[in-house]
């Protein structure tokens, strides 16, 4: 590496890239890219905290209005390393009969528009999905 070259490590939280720049004029661009990556990580962390807050509010709403047997958060919400700026909230419920389940889902969408919410009826999903919810899910 000659005196006019520098190595820079750039990352997005999931992977890191090493870039060899042959001119010191790229230094401001690298600093900007690093700053943007840090900002996205901070925004994702804030959205993650907000998502958990909203998930707990959804659970309170469902308990008050529909009295499900269980309410379980799963998906990216229980995996902070994969939760991102565009992640939704996945919530599984047990014990809400049809068509009350459809009313519950509609109520959740109307009451909590800040996030896309997938409200899953555990009683009708595949065995594989039910197993995934049971293994990774967290009770709300």
Give the ranges of each region predicted by the language model.
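Catalytic core of pol beta-like nucleotidyltransferases
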Residues: 2-69, 79-85, 95-140
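Glycine-rich beta-strand-to-loop/alpha-helix junction loops that act as flexible
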Residues: 73-76
